Amino acid sequence: MATDLGELLVPYMPTIRVPRTGDRVFKSECAFSYDSPESEGGLYVCMNSFLGFGREHVERHYRKTGQSVYMHLKRHVKEKATGAAGGAIPRRRNGKVFLDLELNRDFNGDDYEYEDEAKLVIFPDHYEIPLPNIEELPALVTIACDAVLNAPSPYKKQESDSWEEEIQVSRHARSLRQLDNGVRIPPSGWKCAKCEMRENLWLNLTDGSVLCGKWFFDGSGGNGHALEHYRESNFPLAVKLNTITPDGADIYSFDEEEAVLDPHISEHLLHFGIDMLQMQRTENGHHTDNHVQPRISDWEVIQEAGLKLKPVYGSGYTGIKNLGNSCYLSTTMQVLFSIPEFQRAYAGNLQRIFDYSPLDPTQDFNTQMAKLGHGLLSGQYSKPPMKSELIEQVMKEEHKQQQQRGISPKMFKALVSKGHPEFSSNRQQDAHEFLLHLINLVERNNSGSENPSDVFRFIVEERTQCCQSQKVRYTQRVDYLMQLPVPLEAASNREELIAYEGKRKEAEENMRPLPEVVRARVPFTACLQAFTEPENVPDFWSSALQAKSAGVKTSRFATFPEYMIVQLKKFTFGVDWVPKKLDMSVDVPDFLDLNRLRATGLQAGEEELPDLTPPIVIPEDTRDSSTNNSLESPEIDESSVMQLAEMGFPLEACRKAVYYTGNMGAEMAFNWIIAHMEEPDFAEPLAVPTYMESDLPSPSLPTTSALDNQPPEESISILTSMGFPRHHTIQALKASNNNLERALDWIFTHPDCEDESEAMSDTADTEPNDNSFSNANAHTDSSLSPDQDLSSPRVRDGPGRYELFAFISHMGTSTMSGHYVCHIKKEGRWLIYNDHKVCLSERPPKDLGYMYFYRRLSSC
């Protein structure tokens, strides 16, 4: 038989590889679906590429590549036999479990056991060879099989590269002993039991003692009494008192000598009278309890805690597992795939996308979007428990709710966050920033006639007026969402807020419990009014005066999108630059009419500002030099730089992003960063352009020589990413001296430049252009604005009346922590998507949302 197997494998030996360092082995998830070794058909791992495939997709890979040898992995879940007393037989070491897979939480480890099975399968005849089979298989095949079975998860490398080291669960957490000594921790007034320290205090989770932490070299910290107590008592776990929030707390294990996780921290704190849901992180340690008379917290209201929510199953009702601070991604994707255009673009084109996917589909954005869309919409991974299972539970007198499993977005997250310093980390992120990041990826990877992100795109008209000359300038820009300021001064309960603030300060000064928190109630109409108010333009250069002057700017909608995203600007920076969230309630309407905000363009009686370019200031020593010299350091909006740096990007990269986007704001600079972050000089210092003496303009002549130069590729990329053709962007940049803001204005005001466009088009044909989005503009779309020129961004203009169909809510004190859930209206009923759980919503908290999604009403 050994000879037979050896001869059988001879034709395939050149295709069987042993995984090398750097090879990623996907043995837990299919590249095209969410099938795993636990699925009915198991998982097939290619012995050449080490990609995993479910039973429905392995044939496609075989036909495309000709690879014939696969390792088939299958995990069987069996209920343990019961003992004489009715309980499960005690667990023994199971030698039949060898796959590095997470245990299915739906099956209690004490009542179920696992058995793993592996075998080689040769296509197309599906000839099977059970493993292990050392005696009969060639040595190379045996080594390759062992290497595949023992290979680590392909995501562990990425996780270890994250800025933030993953914190492990303490081995003491599950069996922690807590003394029943009657200790109750007060909400304020703590101090170390052995000294007078009131900062850096730690609560021992065994006996409830409050002691100070260790001393730091800068003089802060404490006297190390918490560590001394551990050495005397051997009580291992302690929690830092001023870090307790509904999201968790900072926990340290003296025994393991590192920060740890405690999955049972809520129960352990409740033993000493501390309710996590009523806690808020503080910096000074003087208090944590928000209020003595507990108000129902955001966590309970938004998650609809305490209500018996009915789980739902089937197509469109599949949850997404939380990978650890990945809820910002899950909620965003749930909402996007409730939109028909995204469903059609990816799930609707599933077979075409899969058939034309590259050899490594795990690195293809469209493939992974189609996979995620199918996983959420097919209903294949959201099936209700079988009647037999429910009957069995009743017979056993078990009434526990059946867990919804959901799908794991590991492969998708690894791809869309690749190279991004924030999204690739394990930290919580801003769902708004991730949405813009994803739209950027959708546009960069779109090559079809229908770009699903078109439904969000609209044009904003900005009217800037010189306060001295009263002349105006109208410009237009592209945007994808409406950011609404929330004016706290317009709160309907302003008197209550003022009274609360006084009581809070008094309580802090006297170290007394804080009063019940009062949440600001801001009318939505006040938010709209704040959006329409004129804003001052800093450093405004008036072409009428040819000097800097005071200027004001107002914004209106030149077009209305098919879907309007409204973001409430709840997050801000404190005086210490720590991001924080404003505690507010906004009465967001179910129906929204924005028609009164439609742009009107230049009005009768208004006079336009002259179309002049601000002068370029050149130092005298540069004029006299005969060698290359750089211009003065450019003006860079430092507030935008700091905003980007706070996201974790290198400072020099932030400066370049703001510079190359013409100081047009952090959002535009963020898009530049996403497009250039993989370049080798991404974090190198900004190099200001230089000019030869012969290129320097004479003071008495127009500055035309500089315009003859090719515009920077960065500026071209930014404009083409907005949907403008490359030749038109080059024209616009040359006409505006490479100023992005004026180039945008030029594009909108010069739609018909036929002769020059044709000339530029010939040039563009010879230049490399890998922007797939600009190629997509060659396709016509009947749903676009009828009078829209092909050189304009693709927008779907129409009436500005909308109906709310989804909203994303955030719980927590800042974007750096907390939790996201989303509510979506489907088939006339609201549902709540909370990680892997999908249930009918009883009380959708529309007033506490963060991002709201509206669809245009068909009849207006």
From Swiss-Prot:
Activity modulation comment: Specifically inhibited by spautin-1 (specific and potent autophagy inhibitor-1), a derivative of MBCQ that binds to usp13 and inhibits deubiquitinase activity.
Catalyzed chemical reaction(s): Thiol-dependent hydrolysis of ester, thioester, amide, peptide and isopeptide bonds formed by the C-terminal Gly of ubiquitin (a 76-residue protein attached to proteins as an intracellular targeting signal)
Residues covered by region (Disordered): 611-636, 755-795
Compositional bias (Polar residues): 769-780
Residue numbers annotated as active site: 327 (nucleophile), 819 (proton acceptor)
InterPro entries associated with the record: Papain-like_cys_pep_sf, Peptidase_C19, Peptidase_C19_UCH, UBA, UBA-like_sf, Ubiquitinyl_hydrolase, UBP13_Znf-UBP_var, USP_CS
SMART domains tied to this protein: UBA, ZnF_UBP
Limits of the USP domain: 318-857
Residue span(s) of domain UBA: 635-676, 710-750
GO cellular component: cytosol; nucleus
GO biological process, one term: proteolysis
Keyword set includes Protease: yes
Binding site for Zn(2+): 192, 195, 212, 225
Compositionally biased spans, kind Acidic residues: 755-768
Entry keywords, A to Z: Autophagy, Hydrolase, Metal-binding, Protease, Repeat, Thiol protease, Ubl conjugation pathway, Zinc, Zinc-finger
SUPFAM superfamilies: Cysteine proteinases, RING/U-box, UBA-like
EC class: hydrolase
GO MF: cysteine-type deubiquitinase activity; cysteine-type endopeptidase activity; ubiquitin binding; zinc ion binding
Family: Belongs to the peptidase C19 family.
Function field: Deubiquitinase that mediates deubiquitination of target proteins and is involved in various processes such as autophagy and endoplasmic reticulum-associated degradation (ERAD).
Domain writeup: The UBP-type zinc finger has lost its ability to bind ubiquitin and usp13 is not activated by unanchored ubiquitin.
UniProt-recorded name of the protein: Ubiquitin carboxyl-terminal hydrolase 13
Organism the protein comes from: Danio rerio (Zebrafish)
Top-level taxonomy: Eukaryota, Metazoa, Chordata, Craniata, Vertebrata
Gene, per the UniProt record: usp13
